[in-house]
Amino acid sequence: LVKKLAIFLLFSVFSYAFDLNSSANALSSGKDLQISLENLDTNGSLNVGELVSRLKQSSNYDALSFSSNSLNLKFISTQKVPSALFVKSINLALEDANISVARVNSLKNGNEISYGILALKSGGIDPNLLNFTLSKSGFKIMGFDRLDGNLALYLDAKNMSLDASKVNFNEESPLVKSGGVYIVDVAGASSLNIISNEPNKWVPLVRIYDKNLNQIDLKRENEIKTNYTINLANDAKYALISDNNDITNIKNLPK
């Protein structure tokens, strides 16, 4: 069986000791804070929901910023993690929450990795939404800050992963329409067969990555396909399946 495996990155211990007061101020409207900061540390990460709740109860929550359709975000981790995996995991988590990346403002990878973007979402981007969607990709928010016009999120990234679809050998595995690319864990498979349920629309665009998200193959077609097979390298880990037209469903069958 091809198993859905989270990529556990066992690198340096997370060294950022987040400041609860800085986190509270980062989410506040700038007034004098009159909230308790007790019990906001949950298993080594910030209890974002409780902090937001306390700020709202005390009328300190920055509702104006977080109801705006755009927000400058900077994701920071002091752990030594592959930058491609860090960025891709964040981007896919945001996409899953219907948050668009309008612009990449910065990307640095030294003693710490930081990824700055202009994020867009109708109705606003609030801390609870960010916490929920990032947690699904294995991130923990350790704290917040305000840095050079950005809302900075300090992340524990040691358990980050791509949310890849689970597939079985020699069985059709329907993929639920995602609104974006389909991500399939193909580890252990020698080939991937993709069948489109929309025979008059799908034009294949498939990228193959290794476990560190280095692209090792690209398949791009200019004609409509209904059945498409790709031979996979031994180190293939992920297949990102895209298309140039709208499709209702794709099925894949690793062999």
Predicted regions and their residues:
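N-terminal leader/presequence regions that precede the main folded/catalytic core
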Residues: L1-E95
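Solvent-exposed serine/threonine-rich low-complexity stretches and specific carbohydrate-binding patches
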Residues: V101-S106, D217-I224
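Noncatalytic modules at the cell exterior or secretory-pathway interfaces
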Residues: I113-I117, G123-K140, A189-N193, N231-N252
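Surface-exposed beta-loop interaction hotspot
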Residues: I117-L175
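Exposed low-complexity, polar/acidic, P/S/T/G-rich flexible segments that act as propeptides
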Residues: A152, A157-M160, D246-K255
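Non-catalytic, beta-strand-enriched accessory regions in extracellular/secretory proteins
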Residues: E171-A187, N227
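Non-cytosolic beta-sheet module surface loops
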Residues: I195-P199
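Short, surface-exposed beta-strand/strand-loop-strand elements in extracellular ectodomains
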Residues: N200-Q215
